[in-house]
């Protein structure tokens, strides 16, 4: 590169970065795809997608709340905290430095319209942005229906060809209304291949095979199948004409859980334009034909059964005279020379012309989100039987040693390490720079994950040559496409002391956690390797980018920091100490010293195993981060005792390995709780010290005593934060400086710490008290107080709060430098690690269980349960203890079931891993189906009869001895490519020996040894059945969870688990095995900041401001992640809800439809997040009068939920209430009642018989029964409602009175009915004169109000008259209550009036009586400030009621 001009280098760099931003072949670049496809498909949509959205009112202002922490963001985005906070501090500082115009530049780039002239097509006007590249117009044209068949063309403006990588703003003469011409260019070999591949992609664009096979980042979506097309294009209509009857399997109490409805509409075949399109066996052209311009040959069989051989030349494609057995490349007569292959095929095949037009129409009608590639591959656990077609390009992709050409920067294999590190080095001063940097980081990372996954599969499948082929299969290592692959086995007894293979299996996952946190901290100058951990076919493969130069020298020569032999030889390095110390402040890692074998003192700022290597590129890399965090002593056998509480709970549990570490989330929560304790302790002591002095100063006693009464309250009232705000408490390390030296600095540090999750008022009072005393003369006394507080919380500094952890504190074989009298003695360091582990058991787990009792975000399956535990720092190895706690709480029975099924699945996965390693490739399908039979059914019949016949047939064809001999030879030649399954042939049929009884006894043992969990009923584990019935598990849910955990894909059909005579699963039911991939998730930090600010605005009631900020967050997310990402889906859901609350249900529907589509694509069609997206979409459909669509969506959500977790779940209660209300609206009272009664039963179970939710359910049941004429039952149910309201809200409350009125009406109707019935019985006929029975069918408006209410949205109407009355009442009360001084203050304090007003509204919305003493209990949310409300005659404010 040194010989390139600076301009050329810059252009190449731009090309590289662009390569990063362009996705797979034929897809549009992310940013462009998003805007133009949506602009075209959905002009009505006005949020978040177009970069021309209005920016937030003041961006710099908007960022200010972020400096106070993430209070609003606890469940906003699902990333990790440390990066967010560190970026946040940085961003805040940088935003002060830079002018607003910089921030706006990226958000409001200028848009203008240009005209595109293509040959043979009408002129086309498109909207472009000045920031786009010419390449993006290229991609747009390749995606449009009328121009998609062109790939080899240039764009010209006034006769000048435009540079593909130039930004539009840099092109001279390009302005509003400019005409750009499309000029066909001559083909080269590469362009011809690109064209053929593009044509093939167009022909299979409607085929779901790629999504089922898990390739090219395709994934499934069924939303439009369920709603029968785009919801937005439907006509509004009442649903009387539509059949609203739910399928039988969706009805409450249905026992069947069919699998086929999971993928509706599967098996419908689209139009088929060609039988075969493939490269010809006559390739490549011989020398003489090259000189005539032949580039390649194709072979085509049309639907009319005609066979053609086609030549590609620089001018296009033509028919030649070759046949299957005669090579004659001369042009045929006629030869139909066409520049586009599509045009040629249209001329030779009328069927092709017709079908291709139909396909194009269908393709462009699909929502853009249905066809955009996802950033990471999503695999589906069930698939229909797919037809396998001839596809030369697929074959070429599979067997070529390179990846498809789209993965290459021209002329070289990608240097992953260079790309990953260069993107991190991009500037990040301004918002536009940060966006470009994060976008590049994300794109390179997702490409790396794709390549690493492909490589790992190739390694296990035996398609890659090992770099040490002579060694045993388990010890082999591989390099493929500049990525290094190693297997999860204990090579060279490296982990012998730590647990051998068990430790080697866990180490890559721990290492990945380390890479994640160091990447998130993002210290400039410190580099981590690109790391991906792949589990495939029972093997764990670690894929890493390669440090430049590391392969040229021995590891001993490379390492300049850390130890390669677990602490015997330890090295340190000044630069590494500086870099790691900076990172360690954020990660709570304590710098510490150890002794090497020469007894020399070596300082470290990380664990001993962490190695520092300076690459040939001069960068400082760290690797082997498996002990980034301190060990979890609850799972280690130590010489020291644990606390009594931990021992009582059965700890320590000894694991197979010694690499159990605490999570970063736990350490942050622990440090925060200790800091709170420190502040309270010190403030309380200082307050007591002060009160002693005050007694000596009699003259000031009266005035000071009044202050003292308030302050102790403030200090004593500070409770431990129930859910510490997720703050990177890097500041905490130096929170309280040594006070005697620098009081001012100490005070600023404390001010900074207001956000550390401490209850504000009380803690601030405590701090003020401390500061006022610390600035006094008696420094020695206050110094003593701080010292005592430090001792009380176990601080590692005598006069400062300093809680950090030494990760090596319990590492075997490491000698520590210990100063026993110091504050940071080894004993204290060890105690802190023990305390943190105890904090997990005594505080985090009970608080998790307690918080689950309100069922607000109830986990639906093992994955969501695991995420929830991790967010609190609870490792999955504590799941057994969590399950035991849950078992004791009746309301959490559903969560106990989920926890137990997750335990069983994980235990089964552990056994399955080694089971797969002992199975040879030819028996794989038979072995997996046999395992599933043993795991889920009671039958002992083995399902492998078919498999044996197949392999027997192959074995008999040649002598088995010869076969064995060949294998042995292969092995000694080292060409078995890391397939340990070929190690010993006699093991090949070991899998057949497994029985249901032996498998379940292994599962029982695994549960006991790993989780200390006793599986009930004890001793009755011959098969799954006793366990399933005891814990109320569902076999279909277990099957789904097992397949997702292990990567097994099964055939989509109905499985009968109760069959006694033949096995449930046969080998034909195992369709595929996919990799399970773990990797880090790079974050969009600025978008995160906008999102959290928007959330806090919404919580304050400023919905419009919140909407603008979250729209902007979506904009930035689209910039960084592209169109598809789980965080984009969260943003869309929030925007839809805001649109609905602000009175635009149509807009809400448009946005929520995109949220559902995106969630299906990036999370999976049956992921709990996707299920959660369906319910709001149904609500917005109902609000837009699309009643039958709303029901279909709710039926879909309920069906998916029953597959995932069964009917016993709080979310099912909500879904059933929604379904019943809509069925009630269309007059299907009997069906409605079945769903309502089920919802009522669940609500009583989860919320208690006297909760307001249950009262609402009783009322809905009564309402439905009265519509059916069953007044007696209705009366009984309404009495329940009345009793609950009376008890909870009091007799005078509006709700109680409404219920009372309802009772009166029902009683009246019941009396009328009874009289009529008596009349009939006595006389045999009706006498006239009785009033008619009034059965009032509900209005759509009343049903919608009720739907809003049960979904947590209530609109409160407050007229200006009511506002005026309320203000007068408040002022009157204040005047009565106080002195003239207070009255004056009351008049002046408009804010107080506003606050009380919003509280009144919130109380009204929640249906709670407004009383003086409980005003502070409810979080306030009003749509606008109350001064605005007073001006409006009637104002609707939407409250979100949990």
UniProtKB/Swiss-Prot annotation:
Asked whether the UniProt record includes Aminoacyl-tRNA synthetase among its keywords, one would answer no
Segments forming domain Clu: 394-636
**In the record, what lineage is assigned to the organism producing the protein?**
Eukaryota, Metazoa, Ecdysozoa, Arthropoda, Hexapoda
For the keyword DNA repair, the answer is no
Enumerate the TPR repeat regions by residue range. 1087-1120, 1213-1246, 1248-1281
Keywords noted in UniProt: Cytoplasm, Repeat, TPR repeat
What are the subcellular locations of this protein? Cytoplasm
Disordered: region residues? 38-100, 237-258, 696-763, 949-984, 1373-1442
Q: Where is the composition biased (Polar residues)?
A: 949-958, 1424-1442
Q: Can you say what this protein is called?
A: Clustered mitochondria protein homolog
Cellular-component GO terms for this entry = cytoplasm
The molecular function terms of the Gene Ontology recorded here are:
mRNA binding
A single GO BP term for this record reads:
intracellular distribution of mitochondria
The Swiss-Prot or TrEMBL record describes its family as follows: Belongs to the CLU family.
Please note every region of biased composition (Low complexity).
Answer: 1380-1390
- Function according to Swiss-Prot or TrEMBL: mRNA-binding protein involved in proper cytoplasmic distribution of mitochondria.
Family matches, as PROSITE patterns: CLU
Bias class Basic and acidic residues marks the residues at 82-100, 696-714, 737-763
Please tell me where this protein is predominantly located. cytoplasm
Q: Which CDD domains match?
A: CLU-central (cd15466)
Coiled-coil stretches, from where to where? none
